[in-house]
Amino acid sequence: MGKPDIIYEDNDIIVCYKPAGIATQTRHIGQQDMESFIRNYRAAKNEPPYVGIVHRLDQPVEGVMVFAKNQKAAASLSRQIKEHTTEKYYRAASRGQGVSGAAVEDEEESFQDKSAYASKVPVDDKKEDTHDPAWHTLTDYISFDKRTNTSKITSEKDRLAKKAVLQYRVISVTPDRDSSQNECIKTEFDIKLLTGRHHQIRLQLAHIGYPLIGDTKYGKPASNNSGTGSKSGRTGGGAREQLALCSYKIVFDHPATGERMTFVLP
């Protein structure tokens, strides 16, 4: 398990790297979480212990997060998230083969036809043009089961369901091997999350036949759990892999100055 890291700090916000395996917030005594990490960090500097949690990453997900250092900043960031003016981008990887008719199939064929195995689409640190034809939109309705801590795709008629929307594009298609050393294909995705539903990315990609590597809730352990994860969200060979999902970029307006700020993991 990696360690949390401070990426940026000023009088109003703290931007951090959250490693996989650490919860954003937990009720379990003695278990490390990001809230405690920041609270202790501020206490060591003789600062008020306030930590404003305005968004979350699931425990097995690594990535960049922003926390508020005061209530005014927390209110501003929370409002931006509610109004969908923040931008959150993820990298994900799957060894799935996709379901018939999935838009990804065309992307994979394009990579293969051009002998583009192991090639990468450059990702600009500025605002992504998600109107580009390379981007596809997934819209589903998701219901959450608190008893099992899982979600499922359901219908718009389900009164408990919430609309879930994301955009994605294929950024690489490479030869790989599963945990049984069978040859397969690994597909890497760039994802823009437009709504923040429970396990949304994991569930929606699994629903179109691309369960994430390392996902034991919505994937197939036999083909999705070999290798070790990395800070980039990419995966390789070895024992067991972490969940191949990384929140690599977040964009928001500074709560005090209004400046548009972008933070990208290296």
Predicted features, each with a name:
Residues 1-266:
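RNA pseudouridine synthases
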